[in-house]
Structure formats: structure tokens, C-alpha cells
């Protein structure tokens, strides 16, 4: 006992010191970011008065300018240049030059960059959310959940664990190489390209940027033409934080444009990250194949939401509605297929109907609305076509939410929260990605049936399984083909930033987030060196030195069994043979050569 007391005292003292150090706030400088232009309500300035503004929608875009509007009100926000391929290549070249300097930076400096960003985000949550709301139509609460919390979680994870997972990692050397030390090193790739969507403009920029910059890379991000206004403001935050730590200019860049701009980016960088539709993802792959550029594709989703009869119906109903209506249903990992056990089917529909009836949609910054606008005007027509197809094939509308006061020019930007019942897999709503506030509910009888239904999709991003038995929920989830699974919850995986995120099938491949996503930004290099240099070096055994001996293959046979044989006695017997070969070889070689 006396032997352990000093160790216990030291451990206790260490814990106390660590706790006291936590009470000392880190020295993190503040940054100033000009937000005067994004706080104005709409742009009716003389500068932009000559531009034709279509009465509705964003489909009429100039080839040379990216025109920006508020989806919720259709107020004009301004325009940004659509970069040419030559301009894109110039931006990548500048980032590549800056990256060579940044690759030598310390993790201490990189962590300070993250802390500066985190401090600014926490202190300017309302500004960041309002900008996102204006550019995408989502509510402030939806922006806080999807933009602020997810980004802060990623920064916090990188601060606490990022360096650990980028340091050289020791690996076992195996039986044949016991005299060697093996490790894996993680080096920056160079310049990473990212093409990101409009649904969460703040997080979609910060997510790849944080991983790329922390791992020593430069990054050029093409923002969506439907969220360029917010993307260019968020870029100012990154620029200010980089300048505060003395990072080289142009390390990070945000570019605007259309397909031509994105294609040029794919052919210019060392790795591509694409988040978007399956159709565009296939185009990215084809273009990347020309230069053998590695790609990570996070594409569409049609997540299954499974509710067993032993689940808490009232609790699950709240989660289900949030999973459907968050950001007006415009989520990559969105709940799009609901499978409810027949014994609780009616009860679940009743609970969901009650909640959805209380939901109102409207311009998020003009009143207290639960749900905002649809970002793309033409998408409302697509959503209605999915509903009509289901109704034509026997489905029914259980309930639809209500609208607040909508401006005439923005009426097509909204779609009511809709619950469909009596649906089946013959309907498009259960097969095509909706990306909207529609909840189609289908009943099932057995676990085997619901697993088959959940896997009957070309998409395979995520799933959620609810059951009073955790074991049962885990058993069901383990048999569903997808990259992300939540037990008795929905989409909680994304708030666990140590976890990789991505899917299979038409939902893409590769992973971002977590250890796997961080290391995906790296050149993964295997390194082997002598363990006892210079005392023990690798030496070619005499039997297989050139010119090889007559019994070289017999030597190899004995060596293989010595190293890998399953029976210890056979291995020892073979070891004796190996030693004989090594000691007798010189005379054997001599006799062999003389005979010729």
C-alpha cells in the first residue's frame, strides 16, 4: 500500500493542476468582419438598378453573373462574378503557393486559427444565422441547429483531437520484419477543391475548410450559385481569422460561378470534395477521371425512419417531425421514408397530425414561423408532382400545415408540411429524393419486412431505428445498407464529429468528418526503418543472392514455414533447416559453379 500512495498523490495533483488550468481563459484575439452590406434589407441601389430581376425564381441567371435573391421574399441581394476556367486556375495557383508555407506551420498556430473562428461564431451567432436565413429561406432556429452547432462541434473536436490523429502512427511490423519499425505518416495533399451546396451555406463552407486547413492544405471552395451571397460573406470571416494568425494570403479561397467554374476546379486541384446531387456527382467523377484526381462524393439521401411497436410514440413523433421539417426538409441526411409498425400506425399518425397542424410556414425574418421557404422556386413544383403521383396511386393526405402572410412574388417559394399515408414502394415519393417537407408513412408487420423495405432504395446514406429494445433496434440497423445509423434517435451522428459521414450506392462514397475525413485530406505515407540501426540491417540471405543457389527455392519453403507455420514444432523444425541452408550455402555455391 505505501508504494501506491505517491502515485495516487501525483495523479490527484495532476488532475487539480489540469482543472485549474482550465479556469484560465485562452488568449484569443477578436477579429473584425465588415457586415454592413449584409445587414441591409434588399438591394435597390442605383448600382444594381440596370439588372433585370425575374419576377419569380432563380432559373434566369446571366452567364457572366450569379444573381442572388432572398427565397422567402424574392428581394434582390446582388450579384457575383461567374469565374472563367482561367480565373479558377489562377486562384488555385495562388492557393498552392500559400499552401507550401502553411504546410510548415505548427499545430499550435492552427489551433489558434480555430479558436479565433470559434470565438467569432459564438459572439456573432445571430448575424451568421440571419445571413443564412436571408440567402436560403430557413428559420433562425434551423440555422442555429444546422449551421452554428455543427460547425462549433467540428471545431471543438479538431481542437481536442485533431493533432492526435495527424501525428505519425506506429504499426506492427509482422514476423518477417521484426527488426524494423513501421509507421504511417500523414502529410498535406496540397490544394483541395470543394463544391458545396446551398442548403447550409455556412457549415458547408466551414466543414471542408476546417479539415483541409488543419491538416496543412490550401482549399478553394466553389459555393452554390443559389447561396453565393452568404458564401462570400462567410469567406470574410475565414480571411480575417487567417490574417490574425499570420497565415499566407490566398490559402483559402471561395469562388462563384456555374458548371464551367466547377469543372475547371476539378481539373486543377489535388483532391475534390463534392456535396450535392447524384447526377452532378457522376459528372464530377467523369471529369476527375481525366486527371486521376481523388474524389469524395456525399450525394443524395432517402433515409429510412423505422418505428417498432414497442417505441414511445409521442416521443418519436416529435423527433420524426423535426427530422422532416428541419430546414424545410432540405437536408442530405433527411428523414424521407417512414416505416411504422402496424400496431402503432394509427396512433403515430394521430400524434404526427397533431404536431404538423400547429406548424406554420412563412418568411422567417418577418414573424415567428416554424418553417421557412423552399430555396429553389421550381422545386415546389417537383414536390407537388411527387404528392400528386402518390395520390393517384392510392395515398391520402393526413394533414397539411398552414402558411403565414406571403408576398405575391414569393408564393411559389413555399410548400406546406405534408403527411402522406397509405403509401407504398410503387410511388415516386418512396423512391425519389424529395428534399422537402413531406412525410410519407408506410406500415410494416415484421422486422424482416422492414429491413427489406429499407434496403429497397438506390440511396443509402442514413437510417434511424426506434424500439423499446435497444438490442432489437441495433439488430435492425446492422442489416440496413447505409453509411450512417442512429439508434433511438435521428441524425445525431453528425453531432458526433469523431464519426465519419457518408453513404453507399447512389449516396456516394468516401467520408468527411471524423478521423477518416481528416485523414482523407492527407497523403498517407507508409514508412519502414531499421529498429536497431546500425547494429542490425536487412541483408539478403545467401541462398537468394544473385546468382541464386541451386536450392534457393527449398530455402524459401523452409523460411515461409518457419515464419508462418501453424504448428510450433513444424516451425522449429523448419528453422533448423533454414540455419543449415545458411551455414552450408557457401560450399554449395562453390561446388555448383565448379561443376559448370
Swiss-Prot record:
Keywords, in A-Z order: NAD, Oxidoreductase, Secreted, Signal
Chief localization: secreted
Induction statement: Not induced by abscisic acid (ABA), dehydration and salt stress.
Annotated positions for site Transition state stabilizer: 199
Entry GO MF terms: aldehyde dehydrogenase (NAD+) activity
Protein residues bound to NAD(+): 276-281
Tissue-wise expression: Constituively expressed at low levels.
Stretch forming the signal peptide: 1-30
Catalytic residues in the record: 298, 332
Top-level taxon of origin: Eukaryota
Enzyme Commission designation: 1.2.1.3
Gene3D superfamilies from the UniProt entry: Aldehyde Dehydrogenase, Chain A, domain 1, Aldehyde Dehydrogenase, Chain A, domain 2
SUPFAM superfamilies named among the record's database cross-references: ALDH-like (SSF53720)
Record's subcellular location: Secreted
Reaction(s) this enzyme catalyzes, per UniProt: an aldehyde + NAD(+) + H2O = a carboxylate + NADH + 2 H(+)
InterPro entries, sorted: Ald_DH/histidinol_DH, Ald_DH_C, Ald_DH_CS_CYS, Ald_DH_CS_GLU, Ald_DH_N, Aldehyde_DH_dom
GO CC annotation: endoplasmic reticulum; extracellular region
Family from the record: Belongs to the aldehyde dehydrogenase family.
PANTHER family in the record: ALDEHYDE DEHYDROGENASE-RELATED
Official protein name in the record: Aldehyde dehydrogenase 22A1
Organism: Arabidopsis thaliana
Organism ancestry: Eukaryota, Viridiplantae, Streptophyta, Embryophyta, Tracheophyta
